[in-house]
Structure formats: structure tokens, C-alpha cells
């Protein structure tokens, strides 16, 4: 049985399936904010890239991005997406990357969750979210962009490619970066020198205003 349920700005079809009744949404006809909310609600948990960039005026920009992941190790590559603002304009992070082509990704950890969230606030381009969050910086080793002094992990990166995926509000811009230097604090390592997730304590994003911890662990042997 198939019928159409109309909700504000979103045409939703409901159909029977083995998993029970379900919504069926066509992104080409649905409102962009609704598509966004559904997407971030189902693609979870999303790791957070806590990114510093440097403006031409020398202002250190800091912002979190949950459209993020690692995509290879030889060479080490990370990808994140600073989407366009709701008015279609580019965020400071993207503008800085287009000019300088360097950035640093930091681990977003539980002890720093409040600062991560605070750094998502939009401020004028001549103001630094690093100052707003009460954080310190350390000079980069291979890039001109400073890294956060408080973050236990920092990945210095150079931009390999920026791929625009649209021109409208919340359109993606895939930033492909090669990791050229890594900083990992001893305090998050185990006896073998590997990162211990129970010590690193990263946080991740869910839908809406929800976040999650990564401390509820289980292991599965690879087949």
C-alpha cells in the first residue's frame, strides 16, 4: 500500500517493507532544510573535524565540521565539507582554504566538547573563534596554520583539491587534504604506542542538537 502524506515543505511517501512502515523522500522535490535534517539524523555517528585555518589578514579561524572522515593512508588523506551558508555564501574556512591551501584538523574530545560547540558560532571574519573559546595555539610544523595547544591530536594538512557540489544553500564543498604532519599526545596512547579510544575520548555528532561519546566499546574479530 502506498499513499502520500503531506507535511510542511516535505512530500513524504509511506510504504510497507520488511522493516515495517517507512518514509520515502525524493530530495529533488523536498525542501533543503528537511533533507539536511533527515540526512544528519541517519548518517550517524559523524566524527568531527575541528579545523583551524588562517585568513590573509592573519586571523586564526576555528570551526567544527561533522561532514568528515579519513579516506586513505598512502598518502594519508582526510576529507571534510564546509557547506555553504543558508544564504548561499561561503564560510570563512572555505575562503581561507581557497587562498592559503593549508589547515589543521584536531580531534574533538569530551573534555573540549563545550569549546568545540562554542567555536561553531558565526563571528566576523576579523575575529578568532580560538579567542572566543579561550584556547591557545602552537605554531605548525609543516604548515603556516597554527594548531590548538589543548587538543591531544592535530593533523597538519595541505589542500589537494576542493570539489564544489552545488551553488545553493547548504551545498557541499569537499576539501581533500593530505596529512603532512601528525601530533599525538602521549596521554592518549597505550603501551604499544597505538591510540587508545578510552583515553582519546572523542565525541561525535548525531541529528539535531545531539552529540555522543565514543566510550561504549566492543570488539569483533575480523572474518
Q: What do these predicted ranges mean?
A:
Residues 20-223:
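Basic, polyanion-binding surface patches
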Amino acid at each position: 500500500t502506498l499513499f502520500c502524506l503531506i507535511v510542511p515543505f516535505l512530500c513524504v511517501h509511506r510504504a510497507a517493507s520488511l522493516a515495517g512502515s517507512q518514509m520515502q523522500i525524493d530530495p529533488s522535490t523536498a525542501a533543503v532544510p528537511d533533507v539536511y535534517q533527515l540526512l544528519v539524523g541517519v548518517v550517524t555517528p559523524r566524527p568531527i573535524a575541528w579545523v583551524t585555518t588562517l585568513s590573509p589578514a592573519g586571523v586564526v579561524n576555528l570551526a567544527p565540521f561533522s561532514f568528515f572522515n579519513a579516506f586513505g593512508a598512502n598518502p594519508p588523506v582526510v576529507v571534510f565539507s564546509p557547506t555553504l551558508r543558508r544564504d548561499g555564501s561561503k564560510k570563512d574556512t572555505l575562503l581561507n582554504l581557497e587562498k592559503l591551501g593549508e589547515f589543521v584538523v584536531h580531534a574533538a574530545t569530551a573534555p573540549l566538547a563545550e569549546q568545540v560547540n562554542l567555536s561553531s558560532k558565526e563571528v566576523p571574519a576579523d575575529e578568532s573563534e580560538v579567542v572566543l573559546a579561550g584556547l591557545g595555539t602552537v605554531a605548525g610544523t609543516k604548515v603556516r596554520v597554527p594548531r590548538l595547544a589543548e587538543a591531544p591530536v592535530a593533523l597538519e594538512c595541505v589542500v589537494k583539491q576542493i570539489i564544489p557540489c552545488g551553488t545553493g544553500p547548504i551545498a557541499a564543498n569537499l576539501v581533500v587534504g593530505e596529512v603532512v604532519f601528525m601530533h599525538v599526545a602521549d596521554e592518549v596512547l597505550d603501551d604499544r604506542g597505538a591510540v587508545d579510544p578510552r583515553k582519546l575520548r572523542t565525541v561525535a555528532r548525531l541529528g539535531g542538537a545531539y552529540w555522543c561519546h565514543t566510550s561504549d566499546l566492543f570488539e569483533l574479530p575480523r572474518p
